[in-house]
Amino acid sequence: MKKDTLFATRKEPVPAFDFNESVASVFSDMLERSVPMYRESITRQAELALDFYRSKTLIYDLGCSHGNFGMLAGKRFGDRPFSMVGVDSSPPMIEKYKQRLEQESFRDNIVLVCDRVENLCLGNASVVVVNLTLQFLSLDRRDTLISDIYTALVPGGILLLTEKVLAWDSSIAAVHLDYYSRFKRENGYSELEISQKREALENVLVPETLEVHQQRLARAGFDRMDVWLKWFNFASMIAVKPERPGK
């Protein structure tokens, strides 16, 4: 795994964060060192996908990057047939994913699409995964995507959503930021790397509160939802489409 040193030297000005070839080449290390409980989150998501997947439906991984969820899910499914569509707008990420799939027995079960997630026509899904993706969409497109996901899910289907979140109280938000910075320092990032990456992500990654996410899910039609994993300013959610309208 190539180490993330993208922000280790001073940059003036600091460029806006972009999912380019440089980021794609170190993304596994970046995720492990920047996203608390990342491995636990996607491991349990892969298990949930196995439990909720229905024959002859689709799993969508929207914002799939270089395929960590898909690789785990494929191994969890083993010999059980499944169909997955991975979508990402970054050509370098999709290319990395393709390379990883080449050696896997389940490579034909996963179709990769290089496009913006909001451009895709979704349908016949029993599982939709959206990991650290909604936060990069413009605010006016988020409601539409969640509504489209709800429509695409079969009754009883699930949405698995992980996001960086804001605390509604500014003093608690400050605590979250402090502990998140500590987490990154504990994982070997310098103060320069932390501050420059924060600047690079400003106005690129726009988080929301848990309450906003939950309200959006409810507006779309999800009547059952839960935060199943949370670490300060990161949260993983599950939302279930009713088996029957009004249930």
Swiss-Prot record:
It catalyses: prephenate + S-adenosyl-L-methionine = carboxy-S-adenosyl-L-methionine + 3-phenylpyruvate + H2O. S-adenosyl-L-methionine binds at Y38, G63, C64, S65, N131, R198. Its EC number is 2.1.3.-. The keyword Transferase applies. It holds the Pfam family Methyltransf_25. One of its GO terms (biological process) is tRNA wobble uridine modification. Keywords: S-adenosyl-L-methionine, Transferase. CDD domains: AdoMet_MTases (cd02440). GO terms for molecular function: carboxyl- or carbamoyltransferase activity; S-adenosyl-L-methionine binding. InterPro entries: CmoA, Methyltransf_25, SAM-dependent_MTases_sf. Homodimer. Catalyzes the conversion of S-adenosyl-L-methionine (SAM) to carboxy-S-adenosyl-L-methionine (Cx-SAM). Belongs to the class I-like SAM-binding methyltransferase superfamily. Cx-SAM synthase family. PANTHER family: CARBOXY-S-ADENOSYL-L-METHIONINE SYNTHASE, TRANS-ACONITATE 2-METHYLTRANSFERASE-RELATED. HAMAP family: Cx_SAM_synthase. This is Carboxy-S-adenosyl-L-methionine synthase. The lineage of its organism: Bacteria, Pseudomonadati, Thermodesulfobacteriota, Desulfobacteria, Desulfobacterales.
